[in-house]
Amino acid sequence: MWAMVKAGQVTAIYPRPKAITIDGIQHPAAIFTAWTKDQKKAIGIYDYSEVNANPNGRYYKQGTSETVVDDSAATVVKTWSNVAKDLADTGSKGDDNYSPGVKTEEKLKVKVQAAGLLQGSDWMAIRAAEGGTAVPSAVATYRAAVRTKSNSMETAIDNASDTAAVIALDTTTYHANGDINVVATLQDWPEVPDALK
């Protein structure tokens, strides 16, 4: 990306090359990629970048920004200071000002995942409850394990002390060779039994 700089101020941002007119002179889009940094600087075109521009929306909201124009390097850097979302809910459910916190959102995701994992065998549980064939042992064990895991995940979310702790629950770590070291707590679901594959 590039910025038009005049008198130390950014007057335009160009996310992609485009034909532009500067001081009455038309320049083709090719100047952005074909010209040297010094040639672009001579007409006020600086390299432009943003730092922390796209925070993980699950945990952060975009805060304020600071733009630094470096005339000697012909660069413009806009740095965003992202703000952690509230971990706890704000307001009360049903109120206009209610907003679910990060923990509520993460626990809802766990519930949805657990429901999805159980959905394929729900018919077996319903059939057994209505007096039909019993749920196969491996499937019953799996269903219980999914519910237990879901409950332990929600407890882990509730026990997280800050945003970094919540993020850590959903972060798998890897060895240098790319193999999994530790599966993230919120991704460590029971193995699906053969009867459901």
Question: Which residues does each PLM region occupy?
Answer:
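A preference for well-ordered globular domain cores
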Residues: M1-K197
